[in-house]
UniProtKB/Swiss-Prot annotation:
Residues 72-263 form the Rab-GAP TBC domain. It comes from Xenopus tropicalis (Western clawed frog). Keywords: GTPase activation. This is Growth hormone-regulated TBC protein 1. Pfam families: RabGAP-TBC.
Length: 342
């Protein structure tokens, strides 16, 4: 470790504000410099958000709010804004007692309980708040949310990846019921068929990304085609975990700010930006393992740590990306997938 990193380590806590232990290779020096700049931004945004929410607790879907969300929701307002813009708050208000009822019914389903319990200890082993012996341990909240959701959405039940999403929602909302309804908004509305048994939506969107790369970053598409690499091997975790454990926590939360407001289109913007930003590095790959390594490398480093700059780039770098374009590509890939599975 160099001297600057050692000095920074004295002032940057080893455990972040969300309970995650920083990895051994963490760049303390860059983070210290970034966070000093970012605190100024956060203070400015907090003042603007407080003014906006004083006028009305209901967050309207207009251009001003869209702009505010793209510039980041301060942590103290994040839970409230996510709940309102996603429709989760309205669902929760209309269904008093539903979450608790689903949990009680779910606890009578041994198959569901086995699946959930198996994954509890695998969820964020690097987070002190999710450890079994933590007091209180968020594992209990996680268990409650996953059991209730598995019972509520019987088509999906429980599948791997959902534990990480529920975990992040619990960290942000600090409330089981809110986490449950936000999960329902994500899985039921925002992410089309990502977690269904056939994972049709997930498979479709990975191929849609391939189409978009072909159009916007043709040299990378050509490289991947030449080496016969399937997109699912490179990006399935980006989609299924919504960048959890792939990008830094604050960057993931900034992406989710936009995801709840603008929908799944944001995932393509993030993926395209990661690939475009590291195009030169990816093009150095000479074979299949090289390409896989490059796709792991592009999710690390200063570019993704500076979440504010990163978010500016995702709305500039990929150029225009209309919902119509994505809908057409989805339909094309969905039909292709169905015909291949016959």
């Amino acid at each position: 470790m160099d001297e600057a990193n050692e000095t920074a380590q004295d002032s940057v806590p080893r455990i972040d504000g969300y309970g995650f232990v920083r990895p051994a290779e963490f760049d303390y020096a860059f983070y210290e410099e970034f966070i000093a700049r970012y605190h100024v931004v956060l203070t400015r945004r907090a003042i603007k958000w407080s003014k906006l929410l004083q006028q009305s607790a209901a967050v309207e879907k207009n251009m001003k709010v869209k702009r505010y969300i793209r510039k980041g929701i301060p942590n103290e307002h994040r839970s409230h804004v996510w709940m309102v813009v996603s429709g989760a708050q309205a669902q929760m208000d209309m269904n008093t007692g539903y979450f608790r009822r689903m949990f009680t019914e779910g606890e009578k389903n041994p198959k569901l309980l086995d699946l959930v319990i198996t994954d509890l200890n695998r969820t964020f082993p690097d987070n002190v708040l999710f450890q079994k012996n933590a007091n209180p341990s968020l594992q209990k909240d996680l268990y409650n949310v996953l059991v209730a959701y598995g019972q509520h959405n019987k088509t999906v039940g429980y599948c791997q990846g959902m534990n990480f999403i529920a975990g992040y929602l619990i960290l942000v909302t600090k409330d089981e019921e809110k986490a449950f309804w936000l999960m329902d908004a994500l899985i039921g509305q925002i992410l089309p068929d990502y977690y269904s048994p056939a994972m049709t939506g997930l498979k479709t969107d990975q191929e849609v990304l391939g189409d978009l790369v072909k159009k916007k970053i043709p040299s990378v598409a050509q490289l991947i085609e030449t080496h016969g690499v399937m997109w699912t091997l490179l990006v399935s975790r980006w989609f299924i975990c919504l960048f959890i454990d792939i990008l830094p926590v604050e960057t993931v939360l900034r992406i989710w700010d936009c995801l709840f407001f603008e929908g799944s289109k944001v995932i393509f913007r993030v993926a395209l930006t990661l690939i475009k930003q590291s195009q030169a590095s990816i093009m150095e790959a000479r074979n299949f393992p090289d390409i896989c390594d490059k796709f792991k490398e592009i999710t690390k480093g200063e570019f993704v740590t500076d979440c504010h700059y990163f978010m500016q780039k995702i709305f500039a770098e990929p150029g225009s990306l209309s919902k119509t374009t994505i809908d057409k590509l989805r339909e094309k890939q969905r039909l292709k997938l169905i015909s291949e599975e016959k």
